């Protein structure tokens, strides 16, 4: 089970999910009609080696990513999620955002595969061990970003706002943020601090997009946790329920709407249908995953955090309205 001060690298605990979703993106990229193309996902998987390279080479025919109901829909989910956030960034940059913040960046490759306007700076925040692996692979393969990229080594449960600003983020300029595949790995309290941090640093006109999940009934979660542990004893390596917090601080649409953002929610099932991917039947293993997840995007329209935006260490969450010049 998780603790508030636990740690990991790219192959352990929460960090290993970066390789899992990279493998899923690589499998999606191999399709004849991919929802998103990520050529660097395979690079990271092969650099890590082991099961992740073997899955892509077809050497693990019984691997959960390539067999049964779960594998098909999980790969579809990752393809759809990647496309959703890619489209979000396209809208945000078209609106003039030239500061991009990727929270828990992991093995995200958008700095390298998307087209960015001249003058864009991309801030990638994650634990030092994760960024060390990523940066080493990028250097080994001579992969260069398509915008200025700054790695910010910080635990998002700590004072990440200060680290971000110390690396050149300007809270007086609009910005685009994502929290993709992150919130379920944070306690409700850590989610609250994350939302407040975004709200404090985002000037008017800023964009944000997050992926959130509806918590399970506590008894249902406990039952799934017990079944997962039993499956582990039989050789199933999946430990999802042992890594997540079955908590949610607030619904993202409501929280951001109340603070001067205009938010829009898109359930994963709805988005899958929109992009032509199957939604799992209600009685299948993948159904609860798809049902629980919602994508939320928002644009800041008028309220900003108080006090001054140059003081990210402040815990005040009062608000004041920006007046037009």
From Swiss-Prot:
GO biological process terms on file: methylation
Source taxon at top rank: Bacteria
GO molecular function terms listed in the Swiss-Prot or TrEMBL record: methyltransferase activity
Keywords from the UniProt entry: Methyltransferase, S-adenosyl-L-methionine, Transferase
Keyword Transferase: yes
Binding site for S-adenosyl-L-methionine: 126, 155-156
Tagged with keyword S-adenosyl-L-methionine: yes
InterPro entries in alphabetical order: Ppm1/Ppm2/Tcmp (IPR007213), SAM-dependent_MTases_sf (IPR029063), SAM_mthyl_Trfase_ML2640-like (IPR011610)
Function: Exhibits S-adenosyl-L-methionine-dependent methyltransferase activity.
Family of this protein: Belongs to the UPF0677 family.
Stated name of the protein: Putative S-adenosyl-L-methionine-dependent methyltransferase MRA_0901
Species of provenance: Mycobacterium tuberculosis (strain ATCC 25177 / H37Ra)
